[in-house]
Design a protein with these regions (language model features):
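Structural signature of the Rossmann-like NAD(P)-dependent dehydrogenase/reductase core
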Residues: 6-7, 80, 126-133, 173-178
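N-terminal Rossmann NAD(P)H-binding glycine-rich loop of SDR-like oxidoreductase domains
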Residues: 10, 14-19
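Conserved glycine-rich Rossmann-like NAD(P)H-binding loop of the short-chain dehydrogenase/reductase
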Residues: 24-40
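The beta1-alpha1 cofactor-binding region of Rossmann-like NAD(H)/NADP(H)-dependent oxidoreductases
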Residues: 53-65, 95
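Hydrophobic positions on the long internal alpha-helix
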Residues: 79, 112-116, 120, 159-160
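Catalytic loop of short-chain dehydrogenase/reductase
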Residues: 84, 89-102, 121-168
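C-terminal helical subdomain
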Residues: 176-179, 188-227
Length: 227
């Protein structure tokens, strides 16, 4: 049994991560901004050991406070899942929304890793997973647009590469993981796969993450993505 911290766990991919990890016997620490309204998340408590905490990953004080609350708890796997989408085509780019997206999509995952590093060092699996997007690939950008989301994920990818080098000496492996185009609130109804298929694939990838396979930019089916 692994102890796994999942952010953004109240819906979509985060909720499905919690469900599938519990179903296989793991202990899950799930966070979201409003646990009081996360009925679907609370419904999963009958599946196994699940702890639910309030956390806005963009609020540094909340992140620091939660780490102090969980300071005694080894974390085997940290899954930075929380993220936001802000549409942005040329001529309609909001600087405020761009800054917000960088705060949540790019900076918050790195702050989570930095803050919970003592917990990860105490864990047995020692894995850090950041959910990104293929839209963060510079090589794969053949259509333009989506300036805010693309750049926020590209920044995350770059930071995760630095994290790879810094965490390897500590025995912690990293993975920057693309879930596919998923039918969720964020992905919309046109997605190619559902959350169950995406998360099932991602968990298989996560299980293979090791110091020998650290720092990969990879999708839910195990395909390497060009940076």
């Amino acid at each position: 049994m692994s102890q796994i911290l999942v952010t953004g766990a109240n819906r979509g991919l985060g909720l499905e991560f919690v469900r599938q990890f519990l179903n296989r016997g793991d202990h899950v620490i799930a966070t979201c901004r409003n646990p009081d309204t996360a009925d679907q998340l609370h419904d999963l408590q009958n599946l196994g050991p699940l702890e639910i905490y309030r956390l806005d990953v963009g609020n540094q004080d909340q992140v620091n406070a939660l780490q102090k609350q969980l300071a005694h708890l080894p974390i085997d796997i940290l899954i930075n899942n929380a993220g936001i989408w802000r549409g942005s085509q040329l001529g309609h780019i909001s600087i405020d929304e761009w800054m917000e997206s960088f705060r949540i999509n790019s900076i918050a995952p790195i702050h989570m890793i930095q803050t919970f590093l003592p917990n990860l060092e105490a864990g047995k699996d020692k894995k850090v997973i950041s959910i990104t997007s293929k839209m963060g690939s510079i090589d794969d950008n053949t259509s333009g647009g989506s300036y805010i989301y693309r750049s926020s994920k590209t920044a995350l990818n770059s930071a995760m590469q630095s994290m790879r080098h810094d965490l390897t000496p500590k025995g912690i492996a990293t993975c920057t993981l693309h879930p596919g185009w998923v039918r969720t609130d964020m992905g919309g109804p046109g997605g190619w796969i559902d959350a169950q298929e995406s998360v099932s694939g991602m968990i298989k990838v996560i299980d293979q993450v090791s110091l020998k396979k650290t720092g990969q930019y990879i999708d839910y089916a195990g395909k390497i993505i060009p940076w």
